[in-house]
Structures are given as structure tokens and as C-alpha cells.
A protein has these predicted regions:
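Conserved AdoMet/S-adenosylmethionine-binding subsite of the radical SAM
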Residues: 88-243, 247
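Auxiliary Fe-S-binding modules of radical SAM enzymes
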Residues: 1-14, 37-44, 50, 58, ...
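Short, solvent-exposed secondary-structure boundary motifs
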Residues: 84-86, 168, 273-279
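Structured loop/turn residues at beta-strand edges in well-structured enzyme cores
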Residues: 23, 101, 205, 277, ...
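N-terminal [4Fe-4S]-dependent radical SAM core
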Residues: 1-105
Length: 329
């Protein structure tokens, strides 16, 4: 379990240093995935790398990847969910963003709620500190418990980094969300279960980005939104000049011309884009002699580490000193 390329349209990767949730949403896709990969009948997780946070707390701490074993103790396979959807801190995953050198959008804890009221501050702080060590990425946090954001901000424990975005999941217009001036915030209206009538929605402020999508998975056909609901959200965003991102799940309702906008400053470049030819003005370019193969040009972006060997004779698109490139699209 590491940073994975994501099928979620609005992000590039998912990173899950904390998994599990206690909200009990009936439409939760993450719980279905965790139940699929948890130990099944006649199986159990290997206990060695796992610690219980407190006896009887139902919360766990993993210092290394867990294995599933049979009744005789023979290893069967690895699993990131040895206790299913119980809240779990995967300490061994904290450094993973540093191994991903291309600037990317990273959805943090897609398989849980990092800001659930049951999560210790120490877990959240460890995730924040790890994210700060890889500042080339844009980190997208999402919760159904926005009060935790306010609590952390009051205790001065909520970083205000330009590449940190704090999101709230809501399903209707009356639900509370997090929005403070000077902090990047966004809304994920998914699944949208209620109408958002124009003129009735009375939000004190509109976040800097809004994502909207419909319910997917078993039983979702009975809970599809009406087009008018989406039009209302589109109107709200247009009035507030807030970028709107419609997920692909709305294609059958909205049509092919989905609105998929990102906030200004958030990289819309994705890892699939091609390398850009080397720029002579790059301040990080170095020459590396390879014997009979001659001289190759690399980009030294982080300390003494050579970044992007696959881009020999090119400057990687994520190079922080590319003077000639400001837009990777």
C-alpha cells in the first residue's frame, strides 16, 4: 500500500497514512473496499507489526505492512486493512510523498476520515509534517467532520500552507462546512442527495473550489440527482466566481460537456504528460559523464539527488527552476 495513481478524476494520487472511519455512511465505497481486503474466514492478521492504540479502543498503529496468515501461522498475502475499516495509523507510509518527485495532486486519506473526532491530534500532526517535507505536491484533505478543522485552527495546529486544501463532504445545502478567509478550502458535494435552490442557499462564504458528483455503486440508481440540482450549483459557482468540477458520474445527467475546472494555482498537469525539451536557462541542469555513452544532462532538483534519469537530455517538467515554463498544459 503506497501512493497510488487514482481513478478519482479530480486528483492524481491517493495517500492513506490513516484509514478507517466511524461515520457509518450507508453509501461508503471505502468500507466496501476495506471489507473486501480484510482477513476472511479462517484467516487472521499477523500481530507482530500491529499495536492497539489503547486497550479496547478499536484503533490500531501499524509500523510496517501487515500480512494475513492462516490458522497455522503461514503467510497468505499482504493487506493494508488487517482490522478492516477500524481506524488505523500506517506509520510506515508517512515518507511516501517524498518518493514521488513530480508535483501532483494528492488526496490524503481517501480510505478514511483523517479528521474524525476519534483520530488523535498526534496522527494528524504527523501527516501534516510529512506533507511539508514534500512541498512540490498539492495536498487535498477531506472530512465529514469540519468542526475538527476549526478546533485545530483554534489550537494553531492547522497549517496554512499554500499547497494544503481543506475540504468538507456534504450531501445537502443545510450541512455545515469549513471556510475561513486566508485558508484554501473546498466542498465535495458527493453524493448530491438534495436540491440546492438558487436564492435559498444562504452560505456565509463560498469555498475556493466545489466538486459535485452523484452516488455510485449498489442501489445508486434510486438516488440520482435531477439536472436542476446541478444547474443550481453551477449558478452558485458562477455568481461567486468559484471553479466547479463535475465528476464523470454526472455525464448521463449533464451530458458530455462536463464543467471540470481547477482553482487558480492548483496544478492541472497530470503525470501522463510528456517531458518538455531541456531548457538552457535551467539553473539546476548538470552534466553527467557516462563513459563511452558520452555526456547526459540531468536536473538536480533536490539536494544532491539526480531527479528524473528517464529524462536524459531533458529537463523534467517538475523542475522547480525551469525559467521558461510556467504552465505544464
Amino acid at each position: 500500500m503506497a501512493i497510488h495513481r487514482s481513478k478519482i478524476e479530480w486528483t492524481d494520487y491517493t495517500w492513506n497514512p490513516v484509514t478507517g472511519c466511524r461515520h457509518g455512511c450507508p453509501y461508503c465505497y471505502a468500507r466496501r473496499i476495506a471489507d473486501r481486503f480484510r482477513p476472511q474466514a479462517c484467516e487472521r492478521p499477523e500481530e507482530e507489526p500491529m499495536e492497539s492504540l489503547r486497550k479496547g479502543s478499536g484503533m490500531y498503529w501499524l509500523k510496517k505492512p501487515s500480512q494475513i496468515v492462516d490458522q497455522n501461522g503461514h503467510r497468505l498475502r499482504g493487506t493494508p486493512y488487517p482490522k478492516g475499516f477500524a481506524p488505523t495509523f500506517h506509520e510506515y507510509m508517512l515518507s511516501f510523498p517524498q518518493h514521488l518527485e513530480k508535483p501532483s495532486k494528492v488526496f490524503v486519506s481517501s480510505m478514511g476520515d483523517l479528521f474524525g473526532e476519534w483520530v488523535p491530534d498526534t496522527w494528524i500532526e504527523a501527516v501534516f509534517e510529512s506533507a511539508k517535507k514534500a512541498p512540490q505536491h498539492t495536498y487535498l484533505f477531506l472530512t465529514k467532520n469540519p468542526q475538527r478543522y476549526y478546533d485545530l485552527a483554534f489550537k494553531k495546529k492547522l497549517p496554512q500552507e499554500k499547497n494544503f486544501w481543506y475540504g468538507t463532504t456534504i450531501t445537502g445545502p443545510e450541512q455545515r462546512f469549513f471556510c475561513i478567509r486566508g485558508i484554501n478550502t473546498f466542498l465535495s458535494i458527493e453524493p448530491i442527495l438534495e436540491p440546492f435552490p438558487v436564492g435559498i442557499v444562504n452560505w456565509p462564504a463560498v469555498p475556493g473550489w466545489i466538486i459535485v458528483g452523484s452516488m455510485t455503486g449498489p442501489g445508486s440508481k434510486r438516488h440520482q440527482p435531477q439536472r436542476e440540482w446541478i444547474e443550481s450549483i453551477n449558478h452558485i459557482c458562477a455568481e461567486a466566481r468559484t471553479p466547479l468540477f463535475m465528476k464523470n458520474s454526472l455525464r448521463q445527467i449533464w451530458g458530455e460537456d462536463l464543467v471540470q475546472m481547477y482553482p487558480e494555482g492548483m496544478p492541472s498537469w497530470t503525470p501522463g504528460h510528456k517531458a518538455i525539451p531541456h531548457c538552457k536557462a535551467c539553473l539546476c541542469r548538470i552534466e553527467y559523464h557516462e563513459g563511452k555513452r558520452g555526456t547526459s544532462i540531468f536536473c538536480k532538483a533536490m539536494g544532491d539527488k539526480h531527479v528524473g534519469a528517464r529524462y536524459a537530455r531533458t529537463s523534467p517538467p517538475w523542475c522547480p527552476k525551469r525559467a521558461d515554463i510556467t504552465d505544464f498544459d
